[in-house]
């Protein structure tokens, strides 16, 4: 039982004729080459002044100068520094000068009375266990 598969004649004819895909590929390759040449010519042109002040995506990429200024976010101009507001003077500074230095900065060594109170609180807290 041998069955021979016979290809339809129309399919054989399509093999002999040049396909339309190859001609389309040639056209697209030519278009790409033209676009590449156009891009290169634009790249080598000097930058022209652009007065567009919009920062939307479309305007940031519409020319090389806008891309360098807006798209990359690089500014070569000198930035102005923000001035800080002067600190407000305290109205209670005279009362602070009356106090001794140790009370303003805090005592690093507790006095005898403070030691006694801390010891008694520790003793009472320790005895509250189970």
From Swiss-Prot:
GO terms for biological process: positive regulation of viral transcription. It comes from the Viruses. Keywords: Activator, AIDS, Host nucleus, Host-virus interaction, Phosphoprotein, RNA-binding, Transcription, Transcription regulation. Residues 11-28, 96-109 have a biased composition (Polar residues). The modification Phosphoserine is found at residue 94. It holds the Pfam family Tat. One of its GO terms (molecular function) is RNA-binding transcription regulator activity. A motif (Nuclear localization signal, and RNA-binding (TAR)) lies at residues 78-90. The phosphorylation by CDK9 does not seem to be important for transactivation function. The keyword RNA-binding applies. The modification Phosphothreonine is found at residues 85, 89. Residues 1-28, 78-130 are annotated as: Disordered. It is found in: Host nucleus, Host nucleolus. Residues 119-130 have a biased composition (Low complexity). Signal peptide: none annotated. GO terms for cellular component: host cell nucleolus. Residues 67-77 are annotated as: Core. Residues 78-91 have a biased composition (Basic residues). Belongs to the lentiviruses Tat family. Transcriptional activator that increases RNA Pol II processivity, thereby increasing the level of full-length viral transcripts. Recognizes a hairpin structure at the 5'-LTR of the nascent viral mRNAs referred to as the transactivation responsive RNA element (TAR) and recruits the cyclin T1-CDK9 complex (P-TEFb complex) that will in turn hyperphosphorylate the RNA polymerase II to allow efficient elongation. The CDK9 component of P-TEFb and other Tat-activated kinases hyperphosphorylate the C-terminus of RNA Pol II that becomes stabilized and much more processive. Extracellular circulating Tat can be endocytosed by surrounding uninfected cells via the binding to several surface receptors. Endosomal low pH allows Tat to cross the endosome membrane to enter the cytosol and eventually further translocate into the nucleus, thereby inducing severe cell dysfunctions ranging from cell activation to cell death. Through. The Arg-rich RNA-binding region binds the TAR RNA. This region also mediates the nuclear localization. Interacts with host CCNT1. Associates with the P-TEFb complex composed at least of Tat, P-TEFb (CDK9 and CCNT1), TAR RNA, RNA Pol II. Interacts with CCNT2; the resulting complex is unable to bind to TAR RNA. This is Protein Tat. The lineage of its organism: Viruses, Riboviria, Pararnavirae, Artverviricota, Revtraviricetes.
